[in-house]
UniProtKB/Swiss-Prot annotation:
Stretches for region Disordered: 118-142, 555-622, 692-718
Oligomer and partners: Homodimer. Interacts (via the BTB domain) with HDAC1 and NCOR2.
Name of the gene: SANBR
InterPro entries: SANBR-like (IPR045902), SANBR_BTB (IPR021777), SANT/Myb (IPR001005), SKP1/BTB/POZ_sf (IPR011333)
Protein name as catalogued: SANT and BTB domain regulator of class switch recombination
Biased composition (Basic and acidic residues): 604-615
Function statement: Negatively regulates class switch recombination or isotype switching in splenic B-cells.
Ranges of biased composition (kind: Polar residues): 118-134
Domains (record comment): The BTB domain is important for homodimerization and for its function in negative regulation of class switch recombination.
A GO MF term: identical protein binding
Record-annotated BTB domain positions: 147-255
Family to which the UniProt record says this protein belongs: Belongs to the KIAA1841 family.
Length: 718
């Protein structure tokens, strides 16, 4: 038979043949189904079909072909075939209640970790099949060899060993699957030691053995407020997913009782904290009774993180803070959702193609959201208040009184007038047609205001109607109703006090001082221009940008100088050109001080600077045009200085334009406003007044002053 075997099975070499025969011979006469895939894994280079074919040959022959080759081993008292038969019967067959007895020596070997690892590697697939055939019920026979876990409780100075079937340990505690894998290369000795509380690990062992026969009559271990945190942390480390979910659900339902126990909540990692926080609504977190603040602030911090998560669908907040930024013009905190609803300064009001007013905000790139949150925490002193303030910053509602969209933090900022507007008749004043006045504060208003911005001298709470488009008839369930309830419940933290916004009011209020200055500077001499206190709001909006440009030109002409106008080398050239002009101007401007012609050179320089600044205020554009040309009548030094000033002006304009593109209009305006007139604001006002008064009026006033002085001089005693 062995000769026929060698002829008919040329695909086997001698070593594989002997190993396969040793494995298959003990299976002869056993009626159970054999898992040929598991047997094929034991012998490299063989397929399940080849193993089955060889098994049929051995059954037909009826004797083992390797008995003669292993007589020496059998004579020594140890039969490898019998030893292997015990292993095969316990792990390679689909057994239904038979062969339940294991050798006594097997337990001793398994406790030391020997041979049990080999069994662990090879019986996993068969145990999976057993689970399938038995309808998912884990039996002791299909759970593989027992593994011993050494538990060390360093806090209590205790050590205890626990025994658990290998397959059950892997299926319940997936942490050990990596170390008890089926790779034949890892069939080394494994010693499992766990540093954990003995009572907690005992609870975990009872939990994973809850469906076994030996614990069928035992009570199911239960979660308690005192042990759920420790079990949660241990089960998460051991990758017991089902138990982790049970612990998280238990924490959600019994958090008040848990925080009252002396448990350490700092051991909960960020992943578990996020999963627990997602089960809580912000109202439930706020209602927690956590006197020592062991867990409440952590939940609110996670809620703040969720507000900034763009992919998270937050049931507590309709808006998201992922796009939060601050406008550098109106200083409001906005998101992509609120930037077109919340008004900015009048200069940034636009009209879309459908005729609706839209607002364009400019992002302040110097603002940082982390610094903002830290400053909020320093101000409010708790993460709970920080969350509610941030929630009110990103969520918005619409007022049914003023028909304006408002942020929840501005709930008490609905502006109104206590008295109705009064419009004068056409016969009373021709200059105020279409302009009314509020008697309560004397604020002027247009009859038809295109800006549609609500302004008032008093504030009150906004009024919100609970009608959501597309919502059902259940108002308490709609987002607007829930948001309004939260706003009323926590308004002491959410709502910020009202403060008059001077930046956003420019050009809107007709009695506003900045708006008056704007239009007076633009067109001071036009007969149809607005008078003091009678500004047109729409024109002030229209000319906002022009006024900023003209102010920047004024300040630039005052600043761009290298001192060439007052150098000693240039005095002669300037005297030749401007002698006649000064002779004509001196009787008009300096009749009060006739002795200035013999003053010091420093006084002459100051006088020239004042004259030049006054002439710049009168005609700034003409001065800039003259400096752009090379003057052949002047010296080389003068032209070089003028060219240098022109280059400096160009570079400053380029720099200012780049700053404007990067930081916005407001920083540009502030930088220009910081550069005052060379002689101060009063000298600028004086120059503007002198430029606006006709020459004849100035001449007559100067003559009157001269006559009065002469009369006083004659009346004095010698």
């Amino acid at each position: 038979m062995s000769r026929g075997y060698s002829e008919n099975n040329n695909f086997l070499n001698n070593n594989n043949q002997m190993v396969l025969d040793m494995i298959l011979y003990p299976l002869i006469g056993i009626p159970q189904t054999i898992n040929w895939e598991t047997i094929a894994r034991l012998v490299p280079g063989l397929t399940p079909k080849e193993c089955a074919k060889r098994f049929d040959e051995l059954k037909s022959s009826g004797s083992s072909p390797v008995d003669n080759q292993y007589n020496s081993l059998m004579a020594a008292g140890e039969s490898p075939v019998e030893t292997l038969a015990t292993y095969i019967k316990s792990s390679l067959l689909d057994i239904h209640g038979e062969f339940q007895e294991t050798p006594v020596g097997h337990d001793a070997v398994s406790k030391t970790g020997r041979h049990s690892i080999a069994s662990t590697r090879n019986c996993s697939s068969e145990s999976e099949n057993c689970t399938t055939h038995n309808g998912g019920e884990m039996t002791e026979e299909s759970e593989g060899p027992n593994m011993v876990i050494h538990v060390c409780d360093e806090a209590k100075n205790l050590k205890e060993d626990f025994t658990c079937p290998r397959d059950l340990l892997i299926s319940e505690m997936k942490y050990f699957a990596e170390y008890l894998s089926m790779d034949a290369q890892r069939w080394e000795e494994v010693d499992i030691s766990v540093h954990c509380d003995v009572h907690i690990f005992n609870w975990l062992i009872k939990y994973i053995k809850r469906n076994t026969k030996e614990n069928k009559d035992c009570e199911m271990p239960t979660l308690e407020p005192g042990n759920v945190i420790s079990i949660l942390i241990s089960s998460e480390f051991l990758k017991m997913d089902s138990l982790v979910e049970q612990c998280i659900q238990y924490c959600h339902k019994n958090m008040n009782a848990i925080v009252a126990t002396p448990c350490n909540m700092n051991c909960i990692n960020a992943n578990l904290l996020t999963r627990i926080a997602d089960l809580f609504s912000h109202n439930e977190v706020d209602d927690l009774k956590d006197k020592k603040d062991k867990f409440k602030s952590k939940l609110f911090c996670k809620k703040i993180e969720r507000l900034f998560d763009p992919e998270y669908l937050n049931p507590d907040s309709r808006s998201n803070a992922a796009t939060l930024y601050r406008c550098c013009l109106c200083k409001k905190l906005l998101t992509k959702e609120t930037e077109r609803r919340i008004p900015c300064i009048p200069g940034k009001i636009n009209v879309d193609r459908r005729g609706n007013i839209v607002y364009i905000h400019i992002r302040d790139k110097t603002w940082d959201v982390h610094e903002y949150l830290n400053s909020l925490f320093e101000e409010l002193k708790s993460w709970r208040d920080v969350y509610w303030r941030l929630w009110g910053t990103i969520n918005w509602l619409t007022c049914s009184r003023c028909y304006q969209a408002f942020l929840c933090i501005e709930f008490s900022h609905c502006q109104y007038h206590s008295e109705t507007v009064v419009y004068p008749t056409a016969a009373s004043s021709l200059n105020t047609v279409g302009t009314g006045i509020y008697p309560c504060c004397n604020q002027k208003v247009l009859r038809f205001d295109p800006t549609q911005l609500t302004k008032g001298c008093k504030v009150r709470d906004h009024m919100v109607t609970l009608r959501d488009q597309g919502e059902g008839g259940d108002l308490p369930s709609c987002p607007t109703a829930r948001m309004l309830d939260d706003l009323h419940k926590y308004r002491d933290v959410i709502v910020v006090p009202f403060s008059k916004d001077t930046v956003s009011d420019v050009g809107v209020g007709l009695c506003d001082e900045k708006g008056i200055e704007c239009d007076v500077l633009l067109e001071p001499n036009t007969p149809w221009g607005p008078k003091t206190g009678e500004l047109n709001a729409f024109l002030s909006l229209k000319n906002w940008t022009l006024q900023l440009k003209q102010q920047s030109l004024f300040s630039e002409e005052e600043e761009y100088t290298t001192g060439s106008e007052v150098t000693e080398d240039e005095v002669g050239d300037e005297e030749e050109v401007s002698k006649k002009q000064r002779k004509k101007e001196k009787p008009k401007k300096f009749t009060r001080q006739p002795k200035k012609q013999v003053s010091s050179p420093c006084a002459q320089r100051k006088e020239k600077a004042l004259e030049k600044s006054a002439s710049r205020d009168v005609s700034p554009f003409v001065m800039s045009m003259q400096k752009n040309k090379w003057d052949a009548t002047r010296s080389l030094r003068f032209n070089q200085d003028a060219q240098r000033e022109d280059d400096q002006r160009r570079m400053t304009e380029i720099t200012g334009h780049l700053i404007k593109m990067r930081l916005g209009d407001l920083d540009r305006v502030k930088s220009k406003e910081a550069k005052e007139f060379a002689g101060g604001i009063y000298s600028r006002l004086e120059a503007q007044i002198k430029a606006s008064v006709p020459v004849s009026a100035r001449q007559s006033s100067s003559e009157k002053n001269t006559r009065s002085k002469s009369r006083f001089g004659q009346g004095r005693p010698a």
